[in-house]
Each structure stands twice: as C-alpha cells, then as structure tokens.
C-alpha cells in the first residue's frame, strides 16, 4: 500500500535530485484558443517532456518562490522517497484590490495523475492563500484540454482581471481565477 504525504518544502530541500523520478510528460491533442472573444477547442498536437534544462529552471523558480515569502507544497509517496507532485504559491498580492495571489505551478508526475493528488494540492494552496490575505487565486494555465478540465473541475473560471505580465510571458495560456471563501 502506498503512503502519500503532503508537506511544505524549504529552500534547502529544493534541489535537482528531488525531481530524479518525476515525470512531467503530457501528450497534448487539443488546446483552447481565444478567437473573436470566444474560447474554441482546436486540434493542436504536441508532446511535452521536461528534461534537465526544464528541471534546472524549475529548481531556480521554486527556490525564488520560497526566498520571496511564497510557499512550495510537495507530495511524496513511500515515506518521502519519491516526489509525485508539487505546487507553488507566490507571495505578491496584485489586482485592482490586491485580491490575487498567483498559483505559479501545480504538477503531478505522469503515472500519479487521476488519483486526487492535484485536487488535494489545490486545496492546500487555497488554504495557504487565505492565510496570506488573498481573496482569489490567479492561474496562468496551460491551454491543453486536460489541464483546463482539471481547473474547471476544481471550480476555476476565466479571470476577471488579467495580469498583463503573465499574459505577455505565455500568450496561449488561459488566465483563470478561483474565489477563496
């Protein structure tokens, strides 16, 4: 029987070896695109498979999140021996009423998807965001059909306000929000 443990990571725990068994793989067939103000599901096919460069960049990003007061949650199975998921929450409030905190990443290793791990991570991020004074989560999310299905399932909707810096960085991402109650 597998044991699953959720915990916050410290900056010192975020290192490349943490991701040695993590498989960020996605076979994308369809993506959402905005055309004339409407979201349309289009046939856009590609495979994403993170390699050493993506993981090095990720380590730098996650360390920065922690250094700037944000939080990185991790999910381990088998008593902490294997990372199967993580999520990061930034610490800078933004929006016209400083209502948003950014969920900057949430990923589940390929073989561990569909087990509720992502939903539990999302819930932990929400609890933390409330503690940090946010009224809403902001997510600049991959436009793939599967990714958007996850966010819809947890209750996310199109963001009322768009963070233009995030839109410019990833113009095909869907800008989402989640109300924290």
What spans do the regions from the language model cover?
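Basic/polar N-terminal segments that are highly enriched at the extreme N-terminus
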Residues: 1-4
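Short glycine/proline-centered loop/turn elements that form peptide/ligand docking sites
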Residues: 118, 122, 144-147, 164-170
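Acetyl-CoA-dependent GNAT
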Residues: 14, 21-99, 104, 109-110, ...
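Structural motif
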Residues: 132, 153-154
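Conserved catalytic-core motifs of GNAT/GCN5-like acyltransferases
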Residues: 138, 157-174
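Conserved acetyl-CoA-binding loop-helix of GNAT-fold acetyltransferases
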Residues: 105-108, 114-127, 152-153
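Conserved GNAT acetyl-CoA-binding A-motif
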Residues: 129-142
